[in-house]
Amino acid sequence: MTHSVQLKILDKRLGSEFPLPAYATKGSAGLDLRACLDEPLKIEPDETCLISTGLAIYLGHSNVAATILPRSGLGHKHGIVLGNLVGLIDSDYQGPLMVSCWNRGKEPYTINPGDRIAQLVVLPILKAQFAVVEEFELTERGAGGFGSSGQN
């Protein structure tokens, strides 16, 4: 299934010096987002930086949203994750896409212009309609919370 997304290029290096967002493989769920920086950016341990992706998107339909997610290799190997953990892009947002990068590692890390820093995933959205009730239908789990379903 595909969904047409309008993309506005805000940094003219995208599409020439830096590739446009693309799926790395046929099975990829996320499109790589790149750092549109003018020079390398060193992120010290425990520091966060807001980095431009050089683009804006318009999803155009209320039944979709996009998420900005971390790249697993950056987090696992270098401690670079998203400062807000997950970025949510609403269907009617049209502004620039920015990535909050947080160095939770013990060493400084340098992001270079054009580096892949996050991934964008477009998702279908179901709108909730609440039905107020006095009691829920009983389930096996019930109100069991954290850890109540066991470890294995």
From Swiss-Prot:
Keywords: Hydrolase, Magnesium, Metal-binding, Nucleotide metabolism
Biological role stated in the UniProt entry: This enzyme is involved in nucleotide metabolism: it produces dUMP, the immediate precursor of thymidine nucleotides and it decreases the intracellular concentration of dUTP so that uracil cannot be incorporated into DNA.
PANTHER family listed in its UniProt record: DEOXYURIDINE 5'-TRIPHOSPHATE NUCLEOTIDOHYDROLASE
The protein's enzyme class: hydrolase
Protein name as catalogued: Deoxyuridine 5'-triphosphate nucleotidohydrolase
UniProt superkingdom: Bacteria
Organism field: Coxiella burnetii (strain Dugway 5J108-111)
EC assignment: 3.6.1.23
One Gene Ontology term of the molecular function aspect: magnesium ion binding
One Pfam assignment: dUTPase
Family classification: Belongs to the dUTPase family.
Residues noted as binding substrate in the record, renumbered to the chain: 71-73, 84, 88-90, 98
Biological pathway: Pyrimidine metabolism; dUMP biosynthesis; dUMP from dCTP (dUTP route): step 2/2
Required cofactor names: Mg(2+)
Catalyzed reaction equations: dUTP + H2O = dUMP + diphosphate + H(+)
Keyword Metal-binding: yes
GO biological process, one term: dUMP biosynthetic process
